[in-house]
Amino acid sequence: MELGPEPPHRRRLLFACSPPPAPQPVVKALFGTPAAGGLSPVTNLTVTMDQLQGLGSEYEQPIEVKNSSLQRMGSSESTDSGFCLDSPGPLDSKENLENPMRRINSLPQKLLGCSPALKRSHSDSLDHDVFQLIDQDENKENQVFEFKKPIRPASRGCLHVHGLEEGKDVFTQRQNSAPARMLSSNERDGNEPGNSIPFMPQSPVTPTLSDEDDGFMDLLDGENLKNDEETPSCMASLWTAPLVMRRTNNLGNRCKLFDSPSASCSSTIRSMLKRPDRSLEESPGGSRKRRKSVAGASPEEAASPEKPQEILHHQSLSLASSPKGTIENILDNDPRDLIGDFSKGYLFHTVAGKHQDLKYISPEIITSVLNGKFANLIKEFVIIDCRYPYEYEGGHIKGAVNLHMEEEVEEFLLKKPIVPTDGKRVIVVFHCEFSSERGPRMCRYVRERDRLGNEYPKLHYPELYVLKGGYKEFFLKCQSHCEPPSYRPMHHEDFKEDLKKFRTKSRTWAGEKSKREMYSRLKKL
C-alpha cells in the first residue's frame, strides 16, 4: 500500500521528536540521498533549512545558539533596513535616558504609528506582539507576520509641553526610525559633563533641520495644533480677568521736570499756559525802568538776582527790537491793539464795524484831526475816497483823494511811500459811500501789498483805518467839512451810464488782476 503525502502537522511532529541529524556538507544536504526516516529531498531540505549559512561554510551550531540569534542586539539590521519595528536593547537603554535623539523624518508620523518615544508602555507592547512567538515556536518561517495597526500620534505641541513638565520620561527610549549605530558617537560625547544637549522646540524652518527633513511633518502641523493644542492659562486670564483701570500722573511728572518736588502741579500748569502775572507791588514806572536797563545792559548785568519769570520776560524784550529799538510792553498788551508792525498801539479810539479784522473810527475823530487836534502826533493824514468819480464830484471830505482803482492806490501810496519823521505817525483812512464793500476791500489790498514789499513785520503804513458809515454818515454829522456840501449817491438816476462804465471797468480790471495772480502762481510752481 502506497503512502500518500504527509500532512504538515506530522512533519512538525517528526521534526520535534527526532534527534538532530549528523553534520554533513551543505551540498550533500541539498543533493544527498533521503534520510533514514524515509523523508523526501524536499522534506529534508525543509528540515535542514535553518542550518544553512552559506556555501562552503559549516553549519555546526547548537539549537540554543540558533534561537539566541533571533534576539535583537544593540545594532539591529532589520531597523537599519526599515523592514521591521525595533525597540531598544540592553546596550543603549541607559544611554538613551541621558541624551535623547531626534527622529529622522523619513516617513510621515501617521504612517509610522505611535512613536515609542512618547509612550514606553506602547513600545513594550509592540515588542511583545512582534516577538512573543519566538519562545513558543521555533519554526517561524511557516507563520505569517502581521504589523500592528498604527494609531494617531500625539502632536508636537503636546510633546513640547509634556516634555518640559515630565523631564526625561518622554525620551526614555530611542525612537524606532533612528538606527542604533547613529547614537554611538553622540552618546559618548553626551556623557561628558557640560556636553548635554538641552531639548529645544524645533521647527522645519530651521536651516539645520531643513537639510534632513523631507517635509512630511509640515503637512500635519496645522491639523495637530488645531485639535490637540490647548489655550494657556495666561491667555485665558485675559478674557476672564476683571478690567483694571490705572491712571498715570504723566502730566504731573512732566510739570515737575524742572520744578522742585514741593511745587504743586496746578501752579506749574498755570505758569506754562498763562502769561506771567505782574507783581502788585511793582509800579508801571519801576518796571519800565527795569526793562530798559536790562535791554541795554551787558549779559553780566542782566543776570541780576531777580525772579526767573521776570528774567525770561526781559530777555524776550531785549531780543525783539523795532527800527529804533523802542518796543515796550509787547507781552502786556493784546496784539490786536497794536498797529501793523507791532511797535505801538493805535492812536485813535476804534469802534466796532462790519469787518472784525479792520479798525473803524467815527466821523468825529476825522473832524478833530481836520481841526488840528493831533498835529503834534501826526505827520501826514491821508483820506482815500474809494467812490466813483461822479460821486466824488457830488461832494467829498476836505483833503480827500479820489482813488477808486486798486492800481491807482498802489501807485499813489506804495510807489513813493510817505516816511514818518520825528516819531510822528502817517495815518491812512479809507471810505466809500457806506464803507461796507469798496472801502474795506481797498484797505485790505494796501495792507497785502505793503506786506509783500517789506520784511515782516515792517510796513510803510502800519496804521490804517476805515470810516464807519462812509461818506453818507459823515455828511449827516459833519457837513461843514464837506466840499461841496452835498451828497450824490452811487445809484443816481442821472449817472446810470457812468455807473455801468465804472463797474465794468472795475470788474474787468479785477478779472485781469486775478488772471495775473494766477499766472504768477503757476510760474512759481
UniProtKB/Swiss-Prot annotation:
<feature type="modified residue" description="Phosphoserine; by CHEK1">
    <location>
        <position position="75"/>
    </location>
</feature>
<feature type="compositionally biased region" description="Low complexity">
    <location>
        <begin position="294"/>
        <end position="306"/>
    </location>
</feature>
<dbReference type="GO" id="GO:0019901">
    <property type="term" value="F:protein kinase binding"/>
</dbReference>
<dbReference type="InterPro" id="IPR001763">
    <property type="entry name" value="Rhodanese-like_dom"/>
</dbReference>
<keyword id="KW-0498">Mitosis</keyword>
<feature type="modified residue" description="Phosphoserine; by CHEK1">
    <location>
        <position position="177"/>
    </location>
</feature>
<dbReference type="GO" id="GO:0010971">
    <property type="term" value="P:positive regulation of G2/M transition of mitotic cell cycle"/>
</dbReference>
<feature type="modified residue" description="Phosphoserine">
    <location>
        <position position="322"/>
    </location>
</feature>
<keyword id="KW-0832">Ubl conjugation</keyword>
<keyword id="KW-0378">Hydrolase</keyword>
<dbReference type="GO" id="GO:0000086">
    <property type="term" value="P:G2/M transition of mitotic cell cycle"/>
</dbReference>
<feature type="region of interest" description="Disordered">
    <location>
        <begin position="262"/>
        <end position="308"/>
    </location>
</feature>
<keyword id="KW-0132">Cell division</keyword>
<dbReference type="GO" id="GO:0110032">
    <property type="term" value="P:positive regulation of G2/MI transition of meiotic cell cycle"/>
</dbReference>
<dbReference type="GO" id="GO:0004725">
    <property type="term" value="F:protein tyrosine phosphatase activity"/>
</dbReference>
<dbReference type="InterPro" id="IPR000751">
    <property type="entry name" value="MPI_Phosphatase"/>
</dbReference>
<comment type="similarity">
    <text>Belongs to the MPI phosphatase family.</text>
</comment>
<dbReference type="GO" id="GO:0051301">
    <property type="term" value="P:cell division"/>
</dbReference>
<comment type="function">
    <text>Tyrosine protein phosphatase which functions as a dosage-dependent inducer of mitotic progression. Directly dephosphorylates CDK1 and stimulates its kinase activity. Also dephosphorylates CDK2 in complex with cyclin-E, in vitro.</text>
</comment>
<dbReference type="GO" id="GO:0005634">
    <property type="term" value="C:nucleus"/>
</dbReference>
<feature type="short sequence motif" description="KEN box">
    <location>
        <begin position="140"/>
        <end position="142"/>
    </location>
</feature>
<feature type="modified residue" description="Phosphoserine">
    <location>
        <position position="106"/>
    </location>
</feature>
<feature type="modified residue" description="Phosphoserine; by PLK3">
    <location>
        <position position="514"/>
    </location>
</feature>
<keyword id="KW-0597">Phosphoprotein</keyword>
<dbReference type="GO" id="GO:0009314">
    <property type="term" value="P:response to radiation"/>
</dbReference>
<dbReference type="Pfam" id="PF00581">
    <property type="entry name" value="Rhodanese"/>
</dbReference>
<dbReference type="GO" id="GO:0051087">
    <property type="term" value="F:protein-folding chaperone binding"/>
</dbReference>
<dbReference type="GO" id="GO:0005737">
    <property type="term" value="C:cytoplasm"/>
</dbReference>
<feature type="modified residue" description="Phosphoserine; by CHEK1 and CHEK2">
    <location>
        <position position="293"/>
    </location>
</feature>
<feature type="modified residue" description="Phosphoserine; by NEK11">
    <location>
        <position position="78"/>
    </location>
</feature>
<keyword id="KW-0904">Protein phosphatase</keyword>
<feature type="domain" description="Rhodanese">
    <location>
        <begin position="377"/>
        <end position="483"/>
    </location>
</feature>
<protein>
    <recommendedName>
        <fullName>M-phase inducer phosphatase 1</fullName>
        <ecNumber>3.1.3.48</ecNumber>
    </recommendedName>
</protein>
<feature type="modified residue" description="Phosphoserine; by CHEK1 and CHEK2">
    <location>
        <position position="123"/>
    </location>
</feature>
<dbReference type="GO" id="GO:0004721">
    <property type="term" value="F:phosphoprotein phosphatase activity"/>
</dbReference>
<feature type="modified residue" description="Phosphoserine; by NEK11">
    <location>
        <position position="81"/>
    </location>
</feature>
<dbReference type="Pfam" id="PF06617">
    <property type="entry name" value="M-inducer_phosp"/>
</dbReference>
<dbReference type="InterPro" id="IPR036873">
    <property type="entry name" value="Rhodanese-like_dom_sf"/>
</dbReference>
<feature type="modified residue" description="Phosphoserine; by CHEK1 and CHEK2">
    <location>
        <position position="279"/>
    </location>
</feature>
<feature type="modified residue" description="Phosphothreonine; by CHEK1">
    <location>
        <position position="508"/>
    </location>
</feature>
<feature type="modified residue" description="Phosphoserine; by PLK3">
    <location>
        <position position="520"/>
    </location>
</feature>
<keyword id="KW-0131">Cell cycle</keyword>
